[in-house]
Amino acid sequence: MTEQPRCPIVHFDHHSAEHAADHVGAYRELREECPVAWTDAHGGFWVLSDYPSVFEASRDDDLFSSARSEHGGEGLAIIIPKAPTAFHIPIELDPPQFRSYRKAVNAVTSPAAVRRLTDVIDKFVTGFIDEIIETGEADLAFVAGVPAAVTVDWLGLDASEYKRYVDAMHTLVSAPPDSAEYAHARDVAVPWVEKTVRAHIAARREQPTDDATSAFLAAEVDDRKMTDDEIYSILELLISGGVGTTASLVTQALVWLYRNPGERQRLIDDPSMIDVAVEEFLRVFSPTQALARTVTRDAEFRGAHLRAGDRALMSWASANRDPRQFDDPDEVDITRWPNKHMAFGLGIHRCAGSHLGRAMARAMIGQVLERMPDYVVDVDGIVRYPDQGTNAGYHSIPCSFTPGKRRLASPLFPRAS
Ligand code: HEM
């Protein structure tokens, strides 16, 4: 039997400079012309770009596997090309193994667990804004350190080292794989994370506290306690998921609010609108743009002939702008409701940190608007991530504002002497 060719073939590389310059336009074209298409980039993969394809694939774990395999090289299975991270539980597991691990993660990321973190989140947001508030000018991206500090602190690690975790885990998914930054993350920063986190797990095994790491040590998976390797696997994923995504959401939202002063004023006048606005920011900015799966068997999928072992990229960002699902999808309507966006993914792997991410984003946007309501962004000075393929966002957002007063009695972290 002759093999069906993979088609239609498109010119698409989500890690290219061309894509970074206009990822919204690139996905619009794909969605309109061939929502399930093959590209030869990075060894070849399918790109799923319309809402129905992404919806169907993300709910079909039987055909679209998240498990680590030899297809597409070595490393983290859910991105293309794969990145050299440790095995990540539960995101690289399919059912049935997946379920009991996800239950253990849900226990520390549930809405109730996140409500207990309210004061911690507020403290970090206040402390980060304190660091810049008296100056009248700063890089707004600095405030984006909050999610990393909260995540690291929640796991019981030293929050003052939050930047080292960002340099490691966020860089692997936001810097071009051929850059010096990426090589530093892979060869220096990630090994440091592994050494530090493994030492932390060992210390908590000796002496548990009330942090999330101790909760994993006490949790049962299939009627047994987890090994250090399993716990490390979960912690590295939580750090990886926690440090960059919310920062990307908030910084993009703050730049948009600067460009749309009328909408900014509405949120200043009525902060209770922020919750719904955050959902719209999630939809249009889609911090995690696209993640991957591996096809488990030859199959026909929405007109395309998939083969076992093919890699597939599901674009949440593109699905989130599908006009068949959202009226005027390129309009940012901060009152849009309902808003069935897929920014947190869909199906069994839907983001375990969504409640934490939302809580941090609401607190950060709320406090910036309250304490720095007149911030002016130097738009020409904005530096985007050079690669917008997996995570979209900004590295730097110079801004000025009317100075204000610090609120915490002392800085969050000891000052370097
Ligand atoms: C705005 C913030 C966030 C966005 C946009 C986001 C996005 C996503 C997406 C799209 C997925 C689906 C992965 C897949 O289907 O393969 C996911 C999964 C996940 N996220 Fe998030 N995330 C955010 C915040 C967080 C935070 C704060 C944490 C934890 C500290 C976190 C931890 C996780 C974990 C553990 C998974 C894997 C769940 C599983 O495999 O069952 N995320 N996230």
Features from the language model and the residues they span:
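Cytochrome P450
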Residues: 1-417
